């Protein structure tokens, strides 16, 4: 009887370890895919921004050029999610696109604007706790600099005012914060959220 109970416990333990291994492997694969997607979107964002700047400096476009079809890069960017800017955080060696619309699918690719806008000084950006996204937000300290560059090439520089842990259901803590920029992500296990509140530099 004891041997049978031991065998059952052994099998259960092995099943739990296997499930943890599979979950860890899936998370690592999701993280890698998100990192690759973010890199592609960021590269496209900078290419689009440069193209827009070139077009603006060239003045009015030639009518014959307007009749030509869009180059392949422009056509590809139409299929990608809309990107409102590039977020650079030197203190944690991070450069990421910020997608315009929050959704579960978009969050798998890159951090997303969840509420507000840079122009209204109430931007809230949510990102996954992937190594390729916001897993290191909790390492930021007061005074660390962040830069958000929009599609027109305008940069806004912020500094971290404070970092806090908030309850996972406390939406008001990030949405109603009196800061022009808030970044947040889940803690491991999604039991809480790490929120970084930023002022203009």
Roles of regions detected by a PLM:
Residues 3-201:
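Solvent-exposed, non-transmembrane regions of membrane-associated and secreted proteins
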């Amino acid at each position: 009887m004891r041997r049978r109970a031991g065998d059952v416990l052994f099998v259960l333990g092995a099943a739990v370890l296997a499930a943890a291994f599979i979950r860890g492997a899936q998370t690592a694969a999701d993280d890698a895919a998100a990192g690759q997607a973010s890199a592609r979107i960021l590269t496209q964002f900078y290419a689009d921004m440069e193209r827009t700047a070139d077009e603006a400096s060239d003045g009015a476009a030639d009518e014959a050029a307007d009749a030509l079809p869009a180059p392949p890069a422009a056509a590809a960017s139409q299929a990608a999610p809309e990107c409102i800017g590039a977020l650079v955080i030197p203190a944690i060696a991070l450069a990421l696109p910020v997608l315009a619309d929050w959704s579960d699918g978009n969050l798998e690719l890159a951090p997303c604007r969840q509420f507000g806008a840079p122009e209204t000084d109430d931007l809230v950006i949510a990102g996954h706790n992937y190594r390729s996204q916001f897993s290191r937000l909790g390492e930021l300290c007061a005074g660390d600099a962040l830069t958000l560059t929009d599609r027109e090439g305008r940069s806004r520089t912020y500094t971290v005012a404070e970092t806090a842990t908030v309850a996972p259901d406390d939406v008001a803590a990030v949405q109603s914060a009196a800061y022009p920029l808030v970044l947040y992500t889940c803690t491991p296990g999604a039991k809480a959220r790490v929120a970084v509140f930023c002022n203009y530099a």
